[in-house]
C-alpha cells in the first residue's frame, strides 16, 4: 500500500526511525515534477547521526554493471543546511564524495541529478534517463549513503507530475508488499522503504504517464500475476504499439520462465518480483545496445518495441538470463561481490561464472521446459560460435578469467565473449561432468550445491571456486580449467556436442545489427556471410531489400528471402551516399542434426540438457 505523505512538512521535522532500521535514517524526496532541463532535484533529511563531520558518498559503480561509472559526476548544486536553513561548508573530496564540516548541524542536504543515459561509456540500465515524458533510473544514479553508514535505513518519496504512474520494487513504509498494483502505482507521491543502502541501491525506478490518461509520447502499462508463492508485477514504459496488444502474451511467457527456473532450483528467493521494461519504438531507440540488469527482486530492461516473432526469438532468453541471476550472482557469488564496496572497482575472476553459466542456463532451461524447441537451443549454440569468432583479436587472446578482471571487459567489443565463449564453456563443462560420471552428475548438481550453501549466507573465496566445482561434481577439473577458463585453448565444441549425439552445427556466417537514426546498422559481420562477400562492411546502414524499406515488421520476412531466392538487391547508405548492391546466396554445406547412431549415454545426456 502507498502511504501518502506531505513531503514539505516532513522535510522540516525530525524523522524518527521506523522499526527495524539501524541507528541512522535517511529520508529522500525526489522531485520529478519539472524535468524540462533533464534533471531531478533530490532532498535528503538525515537523522540519528552523531559525527562531528559528515560525508556523503555516491557509488563508483553499480552491482551487476561492474564497469566504473562515478555517479557523482552527474551531481550538481550539492548543498547542506542547518535547522535555520543556513548553508553549511561543503568540500568535494573527489568525484563521488562530499564532506560537511559541521556534521551534527546537518538537517537537510539538496542536490540535482543530471540525465546520464546517453553516456555511452556506461550501460543504459545502470544510469538515469530523465525526460518530460519518461523517467528511468538505476537507484545508484540517484542516491548515495551518509556518514559511511550503509546500514542506515531509508525512505523515499517520489513527487510525480499529475497523471503519472511509478513502479519500484521496494516495500511501502508499512512493510506491506504490493497489496494492489492500482494502489501501489498511485500517481501521487509514492513512498518506499529500504532497510539499508544495498537494498535501496538495488531498486530501479520507472515512471511515465498512465495509459488511461490518453496517448502520450511515452506511457506506462502494467500487469500483475501470481506464480507459486510469489506475486509479480510487469511494468512497460513505451512510446510504441507492440505492448498494447501483446501484454497478455508477455505475461504468459514470463510466467513460464518463472515456473521453469523456480522449479529448477526448487526455490523462490523473494516474496515479490518486478519486471521493469523500457521499450522505445524503433525511431526512438538509442544507438547503443539493448540489454538488461538484474536486481535482488527485480530486473530492468531496454528492449525495443517490435514484432512478436522477433520478440520471442530475441528477448525471451534475456528475460530468462536476468531471472536466473536471482540465484547465480545475487545469491551465489564470491566474497568480492558482496557485501559491496561501492568505492572500489571490483577485481573478480568469477564473472565468467556469473555471466557465462547464467547465459547457458537461460537458453537450455527454455528448451528443457518446452518454452522453445530443442532445435532453437542448438541454433543458439551455433550463434555463440559465430559471435565468438567475430570478437576482436585482442579479446580472443584473453582467458575468461582475464576478461573477468579486465575493466574493459564490459566494453561491448569484449563483453560479447562473456555471452558467447562463456555459455559455450558452460555447455562443455556440463557435458564434461555428465560424460565422465555416466550422467550421474551434471552442472545442475554443482549449481544446486552452490545454492544450498548460499542460502545460509556462504560465499566463496575466488581461489576456492574451482575446488568447489570439483567437490560438487566429484571429478578432477584441473585440465578443463587450465585449458578453457584460465587458458585460451580453442574450444572443441564439436567434440563435446558429440557427447550428446549432435553433429556439427551449420554455419552460414553471422551478422550483428545495431540501430541509429531509424536505420539498421551493420555492427559487424562474419567474412563468410553473403553480405560481406558482396562488399558490405561494418558501419553500413541497411535501407532496403529488393526496394522494400527495412522495418521491424518486415526484417524477418525480408531476411528469409535468402532461403527462396539466389540473390537480392540490398540498398545501403555509406558515407552519406546511397547505393544498391547485389547479394548472392550460397547454401551451408555442413548440416546440423542428430548423430545417426547416438549411444544410449548420449541420448540420456541430451535429454538431461534439453529435455528430449
Describe the residue ranges of each PLM region.
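Bacterial N-terminal signal peptides that target proteins for export
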Residues: 1-8
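C-terminal recognition in membrane/secretory proteostasis and scaffolding
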Residues: 362-363, 371-612
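Early extracytoplasmic/domain-onset interaction patches
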Residues: 23-61, 140
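Sec/Tat signal peptide C-region and signal peptidase I cleavage site
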Residues: 18-22
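Bacterial N-terminal signal peptides
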Residues: 8-17
Amino acid at each position: 500500500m502507498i502511504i501518502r505523505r506531505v513531503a514539505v512538512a516532513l522535510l522540516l521535522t525530525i524523522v524518527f526511525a521506523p522499526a527495524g532500521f539501524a541507528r541512522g535514517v535517511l529520508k529522500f524526496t525526489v522531485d520529478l515534477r519539472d524535468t524540462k532541463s533533464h534533471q531531478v532535484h533530490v532532498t535528503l533529511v538525515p537523522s540519528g547521526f552523531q559525527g562531528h563531520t559528515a560525508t556523503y558518498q555516491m557509488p563508483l559503480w553499480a552491482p551487476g554493471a561492474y564497469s566504473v561509472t562515478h555517479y557523482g559526476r552527474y551531481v550538481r548544486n550539492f548543498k547542506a543546511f542547518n535547522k535555520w536553513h543556513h548553508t553549511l561548508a561543503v568540500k568535494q573530496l573527489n568525484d563521488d564524495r562530499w564532506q560537511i564540516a559541521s556534521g551534527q548541524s546537518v538537517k537537510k542536504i539538496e542536490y540535482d541529478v543530471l540525465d546520464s543515459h546517453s553516456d555511452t561509456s556506461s550501460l543504459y540500465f545502470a544510469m538515469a534517463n530523465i525526460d518530460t515524458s519518461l523517467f528511468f533510473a538505476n537507484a545508484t544514479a540517484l542516491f548515495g549513503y551518509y556518514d559511511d553508514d550503509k546500514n542506515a535505513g531509508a525512505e523515499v518519496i517520489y513527487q510525480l507530475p499529475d497523471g503519472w504512474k511509478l513502479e519500484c520494487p521496494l516495500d511501502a513504509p508499512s512493510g506491506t508488499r504490493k497489496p494492489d498494483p492500482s494502489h501501489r502505482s498511485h500517481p501521487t507521491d509514492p513512498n518506499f522503504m529500504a532497510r539499508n543502502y544495498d537494498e535501496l541501491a538495488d531498486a530501479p525506478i520507472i515512471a511515465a504517464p498512465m495509459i488511461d490518461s490518453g496517448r502520450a509520447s511515452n506511457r506506462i502499462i502494467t500487469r500483475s500475476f501470481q506464480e507459486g508463492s510469489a506475486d509479480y508485477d510487469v511494468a512497460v514504459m513505451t512510446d510504441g504499439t507492440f505492448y498494447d496488444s501483446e501484454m497478455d502474451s508477455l505475461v504468459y511467457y514470463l510466467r513460464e520462465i518463472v515456473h521453469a527456473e523456480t522449479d529448477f532450483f526448487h526455490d523462490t528467493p523473494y516474496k515479490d518480483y518486478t519486471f521493469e521494461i523500457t521499450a522505445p519504438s524503433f525511431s526512438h531507440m538509442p544507438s547503443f545496445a539493448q540489454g538488461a540488469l538484474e536486481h535482488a527482486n527485480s530486473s530492468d530492461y531496454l528492449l525495443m518495441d517490435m514484432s512478436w516473432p522477433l520478440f520471442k526469438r530475441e528477448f525471451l532468453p534475456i528475460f530468462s538470463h536476468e531471472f536466473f541471476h536471482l540465484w547465480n550472482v545475487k545469491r551465489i557469488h564470491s566474497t568480492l561481490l558482496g557485501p559491496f564496496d561501492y568505492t572500489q572497482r571490483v577485481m573478480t575472476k568469477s564473472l565468467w561464472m556469473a555471466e557465462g553459466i547464467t547465459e547457458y542456463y537461460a537458453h537450455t532451461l527454455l528448451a528443457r521446459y518446452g518454452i522453445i524447441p530443442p532445435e532453437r537451443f542448438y541454433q543458439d549454440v551455433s550463434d555463440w560460435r559465430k559471435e565468438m569468432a567475430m570478437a576482436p583479436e585482442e579479446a580472443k587472446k584473453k582467458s575468461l578469467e582475464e576478461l573477468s578482471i579486465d575493466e574493459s571487459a564490459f566494453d561491448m567489443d569484449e563483453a560479447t565473449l562473456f555471452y558467447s565463449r562463456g555459455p559455450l564453456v558452460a555447455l562443455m563443462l556440463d557435458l564434461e561432468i555428465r560424460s565422465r560420471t555416466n550422467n550421474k552428475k551434471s552442472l545442475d548438481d554443482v549449481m544446486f550445491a552452490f545454492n544450498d550453501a548460499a542460502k545460509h549466507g556462504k560465499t566463496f573465496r575466488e581461489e576456492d571456486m574451482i575446488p568447489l566445482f570439483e567437490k560438487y561434481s566429484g571429478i578432477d577439473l584441473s585440465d578443463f580449467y587450465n585449458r578453457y577458463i584460465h587458458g585460451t585453448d580453442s574450444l572443441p565444441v564439436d567434440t563435446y556436442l558429440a557427447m550428446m549425439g549432435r553433429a556439427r552445427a551449420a554455419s552460414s556466417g553471422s551478422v550483428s545489427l545495431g540501430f541509429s537514426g531509424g536505420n539498421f546498422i551493420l555492427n559487424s559481420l562474419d567474412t563468410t556471410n553473403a553480405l560481406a562477400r558482396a562488399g558490405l562492411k561494418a558501419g553500413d546502414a541497411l535501407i532496403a531489400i529488393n526496394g522494400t524499406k527495412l522495418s521491424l515488421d518486415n526484417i524477418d520476412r525480408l531476411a528469409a528471402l535468402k532461403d527462396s531466392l539466389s540473390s537480392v538487391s540490398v540498398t545501403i547508405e555509406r558515407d552519406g551516399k546511397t547505393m544498391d548492391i547485389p547479394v548472392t546466396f550460397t547454401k551451408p554445406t555442413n548440416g546440423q542434426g542428430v548423430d545417426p547412431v547416438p549411444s544410449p549415454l548420449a541420448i540420456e545426456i541430451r535429454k538431461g540438457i534439453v529435455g528430449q
